[in-house]
C-alpha cells in the first residue's frame, strides 16, 4: 500500500470511494444529487489550500483523506473533513497504516497537528481514540437549522 497526494483531477475516483463508503451504514448520507456531490468534492479538493491523500493498494484507491491546510497561531494544521477506507478493507489495518502515513507526511511538511471531527456513535470514533486522538473538551459543534432563505 502507498500514499499518494490527490487533486481535483482525481475527482471521479474520489467520488466512487466517497459515496461507496458514506452512503452506507452507519452514515447513510444521501449523495444522489450529483451536482451537490461535485461541488462538495471541488470544495475539499479543488482549492489552493486543499490537501487530499489517497491510499492505494496497487492501482486501487482504498483510502481517502480530504481536508485543508490551516494556518493558526499555534502552528499550521491539517484539518481533515473526510477520511474513509473502502468498506471491504476496514478492520484489516489499512486505516492505521493510512493515518500513520499521513501523520509522517504532514510532519515532513512542517505541519504541527491534525484536527478532525467525527460522531461518537460511529466506529471511526473508537478507531481515532485507539490511534491516540483525543477529544477537545472545550469545543462544541453548533448547527443552525433555520431556513436562511426566508430571512
In which residue ranges do the predicted regions lie?
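Conserved acetyl-CoA-binding loop-helix of GNAT-fold acetyltransferases
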Residues: 85, 91-104, 130
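A conserved beta-turn-beta hairpin within the catalytic core of GNAT-like acetyltransferases
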Residues: 70-80, 90, 136-137
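Conserved beta-strand in the GNAT
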Residues: 52-54, 60-69, 79, 84
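Conserved GNAT-fold acetyl-CoA-binding loop/helix
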Residues: 19-41
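A short helix-loop-beta-strand connector motif used in the catalytic cores of GNAT acetyltransferases and
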Residues: 42-54
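Conserved GNAT acetyl-CoA-binding A-motif
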Residues: 99, 106-119
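Conserved beta-strand-loop-alpha-helix junction that forms the acyl-donor binding cleft
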Residues: 90, 115-125, 142-146
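A short beta-loop-alpha structural element at the N-terminal edge
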Residues: 1-16
Amino acid at each position: 500500500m502507498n500514499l499518494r497526494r490527490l487533486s481535483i483531477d482525481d475527482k471521479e475516483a474520489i467520488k466512487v470511494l466517497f459515496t461507496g463508503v458514506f452512503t452506507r451504514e452507519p452514515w447513510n448520507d444521501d449523495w444522489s444529487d450529483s451536482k451537490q456531490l461535485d461541488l462538495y468534492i471541488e470544495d475539499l479538493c479543488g482549492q489552493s489550500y486543499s490537501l487530499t491523500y489517497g491510499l492505494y493498494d496497487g492501482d486501487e484507491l482504498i483510502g481517502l483523506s480530504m481536508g485543508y491546510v490551516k494556518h493558526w497561531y499555534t502552528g499550521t494544521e491539517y484539518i481533515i473533513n473526510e477520511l474513509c477506507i473502502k468498506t471491504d478493507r476496514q478492520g484489516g489495518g489499512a486505516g492505521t497504516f493510512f493515518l500513520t502515513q499521513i501523520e509522517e507526511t504532514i510532519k515532513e511538511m512542517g505541519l504541527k497537528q491534525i484536527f478532525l471531527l467525527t460522531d461518537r456513535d460511529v466506529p471511526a470514533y473508537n478507531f481515532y481514540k485507539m490511534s491516540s486522538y483525543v477529544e477537545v473538551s472545550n469545543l462544541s459543534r453548533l448547527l443552525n437549522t433555520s431556513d436562511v432563505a426566508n430571512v
